[in-house]
C-alpha cells in the first residue's frame, strides 16, 4: 500500500473525478473555439513579424532603438 502524505491528502480531491467522462461532446466545442482564437492570434503575430501586416505609424525594427 502506498504511503500517505500530507501533500497527497491535499491533492486527492483533484483526482476524484478520474475516469469519469462527461456525456456527449462535453466542452469540446469550447476547446475548439479557443484553439481557433489562438490560431488567429499566432497568424497575426507571424504577419507582424514578417511585415506582411502593416500597421500605420508602427515601425518594426529588430535593431536597438536609438534616442
UniProtKB/Swiss-Prot annotation:
A Gene Ontology term for the protein's cellular component = photosystem II
Tell me a GO biological process for this protein.
Answer: protein stabilization
Q: Which residues cross the membrane?
A: 29-49
Q: Which UniProt keywords apply?
A: Cyanelle, Membrane, Photosynthesis, Photosystem II, Plastid, Thylakoid, Transmembrane, Transmembrane helix
Q: Which Pfam families match?
A: PsbH
According to its UniProt record, where is this protein located? Answer: Plastid, Cyanelle thylakoid membrane
| Membrane protein topology class | Single-pass membrane protein
Give the principal location in a single coarse category: plastid
Q: Which family does it belong to?
A: Belongs to the PsbH family.
Q: What does this protein do?
A: One of the components of the core complex of photosystem II (PSII), required for its stability and/or assembly. PSII is a light-driven water:plastoquinone oxidoreductase that uses light energy to abstract electrons from H(2)O, generating O(2) and a proton gradient subsequently used for ATP formation. It consists of a core antenna complex that captures photons, and an electron transfer chain that converts photonic excitation into a charge separation.
Please describe the quaternary structure of this protein.
PSII is composed of 1 copy each of membrane proteins PsbA, PsbB, PsbC, PsbD, PsbE, PsbF, PsbH, PsbI, PsbJ, PsbK, PsbL, PsbM, PsbT, PsbX, PsbY, PsbZ, Psb30/Ycf12, at least 3 peripheral proteins of the oxygen-evolving complex and a large number of cofactors. It forms dimeric complexes.
**Protein name, entry field:** Photosystem II reaction center protein H
What is the organism field in this record? Cyanophora paradoxa
UniProt lists the gene as psbH
